[in-house]
């Protein structure tokens, strides 16, 4: 028997039934792994915070404009240092967290902890799958990466964003706006695979660079014009509905939509033995 075909309708259902045991195992594992209530305060951040506090106290005692300007310069300098420094100790050994999410036979684990913790978690999952479910964990696909390095999951790239950009809050104070937030992107490779799956693109290489060219779909030549239009619209809409949460969705939709649009024009041109410029 060849098993359930990849991408088949029944595939996710069977995976959910069989891997339900893995879900329960991970629920119990998380309870044992999680540790601490909050990360400890970063000592360097606390140091700058105290220095800023002393400077603000000195501001009340400043008697001349020069003294006041000098103190304000110090306050601003410490504000800048605090914005560049994490307020919490990211490597606090007394604080650990594990998040687990699965769809069909793909799963992703997010770990707040050491690389050793991540290695142990991977080894424990591998052992459970082999002994309890008689499944083999793919070493090639199951990678341990830093949270700032994109991890591939369900066609997306997910990473923990490290960004020094700031914005002002309602009181005019500068705040870190994007640092350590989760960023979800559509990799160009996902767009490429989808277009190849629809058989609407021809990819050639020129001077080491890929050139994407839309192509006609001759299998649609005998379809009604409206059916062809609806087919393309449905595929474009389906791509957007799935990948719309990505931060770069607009850019990649432009790449995807352009190829799809001109593939449709070429399909109509082939159907009516005409040229794209006349469609």
Regions found by a protein language model. Give the residues of each.
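Non-catalytic terminal/accessory segments
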Residues: 1-279
């Amino acid at each position: 028997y060849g098993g359930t075909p990849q991408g088949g309708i029944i595939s996710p259902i069977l995976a959910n039934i069989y891997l339900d045991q893995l879900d329960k195992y991970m629920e119990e594992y998380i309870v044992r792994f999680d540790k601490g209530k909050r990360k400890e305060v970063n000592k360097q951040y606390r140091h700058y915070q105290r220095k800023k506090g002393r400077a603000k106290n000195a501001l009340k005692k400043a008697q001349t404009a020069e003294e006041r300007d000098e103190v304000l310069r110090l306050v601003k300098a410490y504000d800048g240092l605090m914005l560049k420094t994490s307020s919490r100790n990211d490597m606090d050994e007394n604080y650990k967290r594990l998040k687990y999410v699965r769809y069909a036979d793909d799963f992703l684990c997010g770990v707040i902890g050491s690389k050793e913790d991540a290695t142990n978690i991977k080894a424990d999952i591998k052992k459970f799958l082999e002994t309890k479910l008689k499944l083999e964990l793919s070493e090639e696909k199951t990678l341990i990466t830093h949270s700032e390095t994109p991890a591939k999951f369900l066609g997306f790239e997910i990473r923990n964003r490290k960004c020094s950009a700031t914005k002002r809050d309602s009181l005019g104070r500068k705040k870190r706006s994007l640092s350590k937030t989760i960023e979800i992107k559509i990799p160009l490779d996902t767009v490429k695979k989808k277009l190849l799956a629809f058989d609407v693109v021809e990819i050639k290489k020129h001077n080491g660079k890929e050139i994407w060219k839309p192509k006609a779909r001759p299998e649609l030549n005998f379809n009604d014009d409206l059916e062809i239009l609806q087919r393309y619209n449905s595929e474009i809409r389906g791509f957007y509905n799935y990948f719309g949460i990505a931060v770069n969705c607009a850019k990649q939709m432009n790449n995807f939509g352009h190829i799809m649009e001109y593939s449709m024009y070429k399909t109509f041109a082939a159907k009516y033995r005409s040229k794209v410029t006349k469609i």
